[in-house]
Design a protein with these regions (language model features):
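Aromatic, loop-rich ligand-recognition surfaces of beta-strand-rich domains
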Residues: 376-442, 454-508, 512-514, 522-524, ...
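Short, solvent-exposed loop/turn segments in extracellular or other extracytoplasmic domains
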Residues: 450-455, 548-555
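Beta-strand-rich modules
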Residues: 557-579
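Predominantly extracellular/luminal regions of secreted and cell-surface proteins
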Residues: 175-187, 341-377
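Extracellular low-complexity, O-glycosylation-prone stalks/linkers
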Residues: 432-433, 525-551, 569
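Extracellular Ig-like/FN3 beta-sandwich strand-entry sites
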Residues: 464-466, 529, 563-565
């Protein structure tokens, strides 16, 4: 018996070694799935407690990605841009009287350390550094940083000179200043670098409709990137609450200017789709050297500062034009896998949304939070069950048996009772699939999950054939069982839609006196389309801006520079794929 066991042990080891490893997940889906903290500010939760963060920055350090964003009472690190590990940490000095624990943080690598500081209008904030940020191991680089800066960004140049960029105002400009990298005291005067010109640049106008209602627009969220000897000073505008919140960029041969407005602007922009907004972010490189842009996604329902984070493929074209590719940016997107990826072509996995506006059923409904709000591709609306009890459920009908490749479970905050970052929160659920709506198979079982997954995204190990998909609640992190989006991705049995017809761009001419910063885009309804993606740009081969449109055959495009010609294309999409694009349309 002993001899048999000894023989069995090597055999078991061999079988274990030969057993295939679980498939590595290849895609992610925005908003990124991290355990977002809840708003910690009492005045901001009068209409309901809710998760909130924004103003993200990512940098690589010692082979890992580090993500910091506003008021999370900590930060995340990841080895792969998919699995993010939270490190609890508060950076305010003892005695500080502020709810803004780490607002719009700046992060940069200098020497063998990662540095961080939050926004402050005083000189009472420390700069912290760590050589081992995978854990809470931080030390003061300077106890009181003597240069007050809101929305700060630090940039270390190739010659080891350090620069600070900052500003968040609808009155004052973006400033720049050289900082001593040893003492962290200012070198030379503060320089005015950028201001908004919303009379020329349409996207810089304040308001959801770009009409400067209520306030003048804000310039904020500085970030500096150096590429091929050029300095790209990035900024957010016009307001974090709006779908058109984006990032623009100016370019210079010197770190403190003078700067020239890039013709393609905003370079990061996502005014349509499930997630909206792509402003106040940071541009960084992955482990293979490819460029990405992380930025703020707006919700702004329970408070103007209810937001999430998104990551978009980015890059520089052959002419040095900085772009971020947000086309299908909230659909499954391939993670980085090798050097030289074509981010202008995008990283979209071509798994289509299968359940937009399709029939739904639910176990119960709370008030006006009706079930269709979980399939309408608007993260600002949501379905809520009456309780958080185990057994509450939500079901979506795909309309036809389809190939399901991935599912995103977006929870909403209904009657949450948490403020700030609270450890120990977790979601538990099961996902089931059915061909006929009667016989069900569990395809994802997270009934024993112990992590907080507010925007959980599951790439199935093997595609599933299904017409119906159901989620059953087991445990909620807080509040009632509520979903802003149960999004099912894959391919349906239908053919891709036919090309869009009768696409026109209506724009005022120079003599009309009407507003040339906007265009009215119209096209013929495609009966076989779920939605449309419009591409625009300042040259026929630089259509880097995209807008996703559902349920309409027109769009008011308000992001144009007044005296510049623009070029447009459009394509339709449905559950079966994407049509060919229309001919390029010039709008002078």
């Amino acid at each position: 018996m002993t001899f048999s066991c000894l023989l069995a042990l090597p055999l078991l080891s061999l079988l274990a070694a030969l057993a295939p490893n679980p498939p590595k997940q290849l895609t992610y889906c925005n908003p990124i799935n991290v355990d977002y903290g809840f708003c910690p500010i009492p005045n901001f939760v009068t209409q309901g407690k809710h998760r909130a963060t924004a103003d993200p920055a990512i940098t690589m350090f010692k082979g890992d990605y580090y993500l910091f964003s506003t008021n999370q009472w900590g930060y995340w690190w990841s080895p792969d841009m998919l699995n993010w590990h939270f490190v609890p940490r508060k950076f305010l000095l003892p005695g500080a009287n502020s709810y803004d624990e780490l607002c719009a943080p700046a992060i940069w690598v200098m020497g063998d350390a990662l540095y961080v500081i939050g926004s402050t209008y005083t000189d009472q904030f420390a700069i912290w550094k760590s050589t081992n940020p995978r854990v809470d191991d931080w030390h003061e680089a300077i106890h009181h940083f003597p240069v007050p800066a809101w929305d700060p960004a630090f940039f270390l140049d190739d010659d080891e000179r350090l620069y600070l960029y900052h500003g968040s105002s609808n009155t004052f400009p973006t400033y720049g200043q050289e900082i001593d990298p040893t003492t962290f005291h200012a070198i030379g005067p503060k320089v005015e670098l950028l201001t908004l010109h919303d009379d020329i640049h349409g996207w810089e106008r304040f308001g959801e409709h770009g009409d400067n209602t209520f306030l003048r627009p804000f310039i904020e969220g500085s970030w500096m990137t150096k590429h091929d000897g050029k300095y790209y000073l990035q900024y957010g505008a016009p307001g974090t609450e709006f779908s058109g919140y984006g990032d623009g960029v100016y370019v210079s041969d010197h770190p403190l200017g003078p700067f020239t407005y890039q013709a393609h602007n905003p370079f990061s922009y996502k005014p349509g789709g499930f997630t909206r907004g792509a402003g106040h972010g940071a541009t960084y490189q992955d482990a293979f050297g490819n460029w990405w842009h992380v930025s703020t996604i707006t919700i702004a329902v329970k408070n103007n500062f209810e937001r999430r984070n998104g990551i978009w493929p980015a890059g520089f074209d052959k002419d040095g034009v900085l772009f971020a590719n947000t086309a299908y940016g909230d659909y499954p997107t391939y993670l980085p896998s090798q050097a030289g990826e074509d981010h202008a072509a995008g990283r979209f996995a071509h798994w289509m949304l299968l359940n937009y506006a399709k029939p739904v059923l639910a176990s119960s409904t709370l008030g006006s939070h009706s079930p269709n709000f979980a399939v309408n591709e608007d993260m600002r609306t949501y379905w809520s069950a009456k309780t958080a009890n185990q057994g509450e459920w939500f079901q979506t009908d795909l309309g036809a048996v389809s190939t399901v490749r991935a599912i995103q479970v977006n929870y909403a905050d209904q009657d949450a009772d948490v403020m700030g970052k609270q450890p120990g929160l977790y979601h538990q659920y099961r996902l089931l699939a059915s061909i006929d709506g009667r016989r069900w198979t569990v395809i994802v079982d997270k009934s024993h999950n112990k992590t907080d997954v507010p925007h959980d995204y599951i790439e199935l190990e093997n595609p599933v054939q299904a017409r119906f998909v159901k989620i059953e609640n087991v445990h909620m992190a807080t509040g009632k069982f509520a979903l802003s989006g149960l999004r099912v991705f894959g391919l349906g049995p239908t053919a891709p839609p036919k090309p869009v017809q009768s696409f026109v761009a209506l724009r005022a001419d120079d003599q009309s006196g009407a507003d040339r910063r906007s265009a009215w885009l119209k096209w013929q309804v495609s009966d076989d389309a779920t939605g449309y993606v419009i591409y625009s740009g300042v040259a026929p081969d630089k259509l880097y801006t995209s807008v996703m449109v559902y349920g309409a055959n027109e769009y008011y495009f308000t992001a144009m520079t007044k005296d510049r010609p623009y070029y447009f294309q459009i394509e339709a999409f449905n559950e079966g794929g994407i049509s060919s694009r229309s001919a390029v349309l010039e709008s002078k």
